[in-house]
């Protein structure tokens, strides 16, 4: 009985992580779709990140932690370049790359067996379980999508359209 509960909890965790990743992707896309090309690389000051930087960073993180760290794909991440970029990708390219990284990550998560979530991996120099890596990746995605939305709201002001509506609103 306990083993079945553990398997069900692990299955639920894996499914929920993939669902949350897709929700965060939808929210990022809803924000970015409202922006023009110049907005993607806007920085309020030299020490801040643009939406383009944040998208590149999310792509690099998903590729390193999930596709590389868990899926054993080659880790080709250049983290410094994610933050140094000031152009080089169009809005549509960034959206496509982010969509691909999230969907490939969700596909990999969907193929994980529940007994693997306690397996240990060395990712970015950290010894972590697969469960820990997944929780880190989805929380990291949510953190930076929130930043993307915040920048979008600053740039668009009253013309920004929320991607969600509170219960009871029309």
Segments predicted by a language model, with ranges:
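Short, solvent-exposed, charged loop/turn and helix-capping segments
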Residues: 35-38, 110
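Short, contiguous alpha-helical
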Residues: 2-7, 18-22, 26-29, 37-81, ...
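Active-site rim elements
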Residues: 10-18, 88-95
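Acidic/histidine-rich alpha-helical segments that form the ligand environment
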Residues: 85-122, 129-142
